[in-house]
């Protein structure tokens, strides 16, 4: 009986977490217009998930690649 109670509790917690991520996803790619990039990033960081803004993802990758090239010694 204790096992089933724990299992049910875990299911409830996971449902709440994933509902939060879904709400976050909808707010980033909603029909009411795309929010600012910073809002989207903050939203997905708090949900523990990568944000859905493709343009921002590319921008971050580009910046990361530039920083990596700066750190590499040129021989």
Swiss-Prot record:
The keyword Secreted appears for this protein: yes
Q: What cellular-component terms does GO give this entry?
A: extracellular region
Query: Can you say where in the cell this protein is located?
Result: Secreted
- Output this protein's name: Conotoxin Im23.5
Q: What does the function comment of this entry state?
A: Probable neurotoxin.
Keywords (A to Z) from UniProt:
Cleavage on pair of basic residues, Disulfide bond, Neurotoxin, Secreted, Signal, Toxin
Instruction: Please give the residues making up the propeptide in this record.
Output: 24-50
Drop me one GO molecular function for this one.
Answer: toxin activity
- What species was this sequence derived from? Conus imperialis (Imperial cone)
């Amino acid at each position: 009986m204790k096992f089933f109670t724990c299992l049910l509790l875990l299911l409830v917690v996971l449902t709440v977490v994933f509902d939060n991520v879904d709400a976050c996803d909808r707010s980033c790619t909603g029909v009411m217009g795309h929010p600012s990039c910073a809002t989207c990033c903050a939203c997905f960081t708090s949900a523990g998930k990568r944000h859905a803004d493709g343009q921002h993802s590319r921008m971050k990758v580009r910046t990361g690649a530039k920083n990596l090239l700066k750190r590499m010694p040129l021989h």
